[in-house]
A protein has these predicted regions:
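Glycine- and other small-residue-rich loops at beta-strand/loop junctions that grip anionic moieties
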Residues: 4, 24-28, 52-54, 78-81, ...
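Glycine-rich phosphate-binding loop and adjacent beta-alpha segment
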Residues: 33-100, 135-136
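Adenosine-nucleotide cofactor-binding segment
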Residues: 1-38
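Hydrophobic packing within well-folded, soluble alpha/beta domains
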Residues: 3, 26, 43, 49, ...
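Poly-acidic low-complexity segments
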Residues: 5, 10, 62-64, 102
Length: 136
């Protein structure tokens, strides 16, 4: 897993170089039309762009129609991870307890509530991407 700064003018080139032509899956989580367009651009032929960020109800994004068809790309929406909490949360707990859900590998940081402001600063700098906040 890699993290790239979408605001970097060389982001698209960096992703394509790192992934040898684009990613198989791109996830847009910010609810930004600009981020959605970039997420689409970084996918390779046959790739899937998933958007889960909620934007303004009238927000639009633009992608070339021919790319969807000729490059066989998919754009998919996901609300709350397409999860059904009553069904899925017990399943996730079971997987975690059985060692099948490597939560610790997915974390960039574990912190206490008192450190929340510093954590937001790190998040804004792209350093703390997946954080768990422990409440007292």
């Amino acid at each position: 897993t890699h993290t790239f700064n979408a605001g970097d003018p060389d982001c698209l080139a960096a992703v394509r170089e790192t992934t040898q032509g684009g990613v198989e899956f791109a996830f847009e989580m910010a609810g930004s039309a600009k981020a959605m367009e970039l997420a689409y651009k970084i996918t390779r032929r046959g790739g899937t762009t998933v958007t889960a960020g909620l934007s303004h109800p009238n927000a639009l994004f633009s992608v070339p129609h021919v790319g969807i068809v000729a490059e066989e790309r998919t754009i998919k929406g996901s609300y709350l991870g397409s999860a059904v909490p009553r069904r899925d949360i017990p399943r996730f707990i079971e997987w975690y307890q059985a060692g099948r859900l490597p939560v610790k590998r997915l974390l960039s940081e574990h912190l206490v509530l008192a450190d929340i402001n510093a954590a937001f600063d790190r998040l804004a700098q792209g350093q703390g991407v997946r954080q768990i906040v422990q409440f007292p």
